[in-house]
């Protein structure tokens, strides 16, 4: 049988009885009642119409240099100072000539890239054209060989047979003999 809670050593039961005799909850209640708390203080709120609350104090505005913040996402050419208050990315260079030279350099690079693309396209087109011509030449050679073979077969027939009438009669005889021939049949066991 399974052991029950009641059965066990005598010492364990004595310890359990000793714990039951001491009420812990009652002791903690006594401590809470005896502890004195200071009386709650009343917090007086100031009137909202008081002049000190109505005044707007000016807060100091710090510049970027004073704060020492790093400049992010700011790519400016060397020697160019952006005037404050202007929108980003609109005008970097006050000198129009410098701007035009930079623009001309960028355009020249782009045109070079476009020209190289055009050259590649032309080369690819030439290669395609050459391949197409080769394929046409091969087809022409095949056709010429086929025509030569046909001509040689025709000439051999002409040399063997006497006239064209006998050639016309021969196929009719062959077709009639084929139809009169025995039909093949398959039987399954």
Curated annotation (Swiss-Prot):
It is found in: Nucleus, Nucleolus. The keyword Heme does not apply. Disulfide bonds: none annotated. Residues 39-49, 130-151, 166-177 have a biased composition (Basic and acidic residues). Residues 106-160 form a coiled coil. One of its GO terms (cellular component) is nucleolus. One of its GO terms (molecular function) is mRNA binding. GO terms for biological process: intracellular mRNA localization; mRNA transport; ribosomal large subunit biogenesis. Residues 179-189 have a biased composition (Basic residues). Residues 1-69, 130-189 are annotated as: Disordered. Keywords: Coiled coil, mRNA transport, Nucleus, Ribosome biogenesis, Transport. It comes from the Eukaryota. Component of the 66S pre-ribosomal particle. Required for efficient assembly and nuclear export of the 60S ribosomal subunit. Belongs to the LOC1 family. This is 60S ribosomal subunit assembly/export protein loc1. The lineage of its organism: Eukaryota, Fungi, Dikarya, Ascomycota, Pezizomycotina.
């Amino acid at each position: 049988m399974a052991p029950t809670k009641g059965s066990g050593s005598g010492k364990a039961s004595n310890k359990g009885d000793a714990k039951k005799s001491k009420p812990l909850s009652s002791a903690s209640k006594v401590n809470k009642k005896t502890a004195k708390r200071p009386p709650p203080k009343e917090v007086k709120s100031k009137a909202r119409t008081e002049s000190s609350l109505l005044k707007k104090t000016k807060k100091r505005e710090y510049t970027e240099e004073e704060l020492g913040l790093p400049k992010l996402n700011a790519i400016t050419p060397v020697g160019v100072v952006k005037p404050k208050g202007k929108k980003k990315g609109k005008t970097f260079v006050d000198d129009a000539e410098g701007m035009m030279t930079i623009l001309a350099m960028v355009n020249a690079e782009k045109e070079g890239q476009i020209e190289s693309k055009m050259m590649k396209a032309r080369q690819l087109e030439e290669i395609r054209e050459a391949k197409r011509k080769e394929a046409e030449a091969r087809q022409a050679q095949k056709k010429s060989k086929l025509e030569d073979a046909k001509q040689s077969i025709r000439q051999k027939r002409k040399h063997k047979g006497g006239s064209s009438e006998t050639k016309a009669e021969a196929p009719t005889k062959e077709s009639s003999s084929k139809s009169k021939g025995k039909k093949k049949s398959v039987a399954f066991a």
